[in-house]
Amino acid sequence: MHAFTTQNPNRMAPTVILEPAGGCLCDQPVHIAVRGLAPEQPVTLRSVLRDEKGALFRAHARYRADSHGELDLARTPALGGSFSGLEPMGLLWAMEPDRPFWRLIKRDVQTPFVVELEVLDGHEPDGGQRLARAVHERHFMAPGVRRVPVREGRVRATLFLPPGTGPFPGIIDLFGIGSGLLEYRASLLAGKGFAVMALAYNNYEDLPKDMDIIHLEYFEEAVTYLLSHPQVTGSGVGVLGISKGGELGFAMASFLKNITAAVIINGSISNIGGNLQYKDETVPSVGINTKRVKRTKDGLKDIVDLLNNPLEGPDQKSLIPVERSDTAFLFLVGQDDHNWKSEFYAREASKRLQAHGKEKPQIICYPETGHHIEPPYFPLCKASLNSLVGGPVIWGGEPRAHAMAQVDAWQQLQTFFHNHLDGKKKTIPAKL
């Protein structure tokens, strides 16, 4: 922690106290307190983060010090601002970008996000005199985690290995379409004892730019590579996928061998965008009807009804044959997902699995939670540009509920993978 204070001749200079002092991992909470204020002093706390492309994310909240001139965000409710009430991590999850339709993304996991925290005198909207300042670093790689770029055959990926010699249970991590290679979820999970491969599948290096056809053999090659790695347990791998990555998780579990466990975050059970192909089998894309795209009062597109119902007519051919799978599934669902009908897809997948005598999957539904369920304390992305439909679309979610869901989902998926990949049986109740 680096703390800077503005001297006040009438009392000790206010100081921001952060624990842990030296920064922490991005999925961990930070304890924020202020000392040296006047008794009952009104102050405004402000947080600022600059992302890798220079966009600023900000939040602020109004507080009142206690009778000793101290302020502890774990005990003191915010009186208003970006959030209100007792929210110890609100200055992080309530951040909003200064650019429209901007999502917080971490490309270089070897450097931290840096958050500047300021204490301002009073409750004025424009902020009073700055009383104290601190800098907090949020890291993406735990000490000892190793980052290994993978360019093996066609596979374009990055493997993150925990400290030690292993072997460790392996997980393949997939993001949505157009993401390229995103590593921040894999790097954090590697700190929990998993060997995690962040796998790109389009829009990266020499991989296809479009998604006209997806060959599952590419993903099979990635599974083979991971299972053959000397530091990965060889019995089977897990798959973690969100959005299009969740849909691909369904496909891998349905067509490929050695997929022991899959966590699907807001994924589709029908194939979307282009043909899905494995050997001599082809699953066509579900149809769309652009007339069903709605407009919000702000002029943004709401595409939740864009896709045809995969249970009707010729669109039934777009269904991924999940009933073939012997994989253990966990479905994490944002009930306010406006990208597509994630809860419907999860429940339909569950019906099809059970109708074929397969294990009932675990479904956890999070109210007021949108499409992009990230690791804990990432701010909600309310809307951003969607290259497939053109222009900005809404993703759904309310900031506080979405933030609480991210904390719970992160714990749930870790527990699920430990149970199914390395035999550490335990359960945690969903908190929502």
From Swiss-Prot:
Record's keyword annotation contains Repeat: no
Triggers of expression: In the liver and kidney, by peroxisome proliferator (such as Clofibrate) treatment, via the peroxisome proliferator-activated receptors (PPARs) or fasting for 24 hours.
Record-level GO BP terms: acyl-CoA metabolic process; long-chain fatty acid metabolic process; saturated monocarboxylic acid metabolic process; unsaturated monocarboxylic acid metabolic process; very long-chain fatty acid metabolic process
Organs and tissues of expression: Widely expressed. Highly expressed in the kidney, expressed at low level in the liver. Isoform 2 is expressed in the kidney, but not in the liver. Isoform 1 is liver-specific. Highly expressed in kidney (at protein level).
First-tier enzyme category under EC: hydrolase
Role this protein plays: Catalyzes the hydrolysis of acyl-CoAs into free fatty acids and coenzyme A (CoASH), regulating their respective intracellular levels. Mainly active on long-chain acyl-CoAs. May have a function in termination of beta-oxidation of fatty acids.
Family statement: Belongs to the C/M/P thioester hydrolase family.
Entries under Gene3D superfamilies matching the protein: Acyl-CoA thioester hydrolase/BAAT N-terminal domain (2.60.40.2240), alpha/beta hydrolase (3.40.50.1820)
Organism: Mus musculus (Mouse)
Domain of life of the organism encoding this protein: Eukaryota
Stored InterPro entries: AB_hydrolase_fold, Acyl-CoA_thioEstase_long-chain, BAAT_C, Thio_Ohase/aa_AcTrfase, Thio_Ohase/BAAT_N
Record keyword Acyltransferase present: no
Catalytic reaction equation(s): hexadecanoyl-CoA + H2O = hexadecanoate + CoA + H(+); decanoyl-CoA + H2O = decanoate + CoA + H(+); dodecanoyl-CoA + H2O = dodecanoate + CoA + H(+); tetradecanoyl-CoA + H2O = tetradecanoate + CoA + H(+)
Pfam families to which the protein is assigned, alphabetical: BAAT_C, Bile_Hydr_Trans
Places the protein is found: Peroxisome
Motif Microbody targeting signal, chain ranges: 430-432
Residue numbers annotated as active site: 243 (charge relay system), 337 (charge relay system), 371 (charge relay system)
Pathway: Lipid metabolism; fatty acid metabolism
Principal subcellular localisation of the protein: other
GO cellular component terms, semicolon-separated: cytosol; peroxisome
E.C. number: 3.1.2.2
GO terms assigned for molecular function: carboxylic ester hydrolase activity; fatty acyl-CoA hydrolase activity
Protein name, UniProt field: Acyl-coenzyme A thioesterase 3
Keyword vocabulary terms for this entry: Fatty acid metabolism, Hydrolase, Lipid metabolism, Peroxisome, Serine esterase
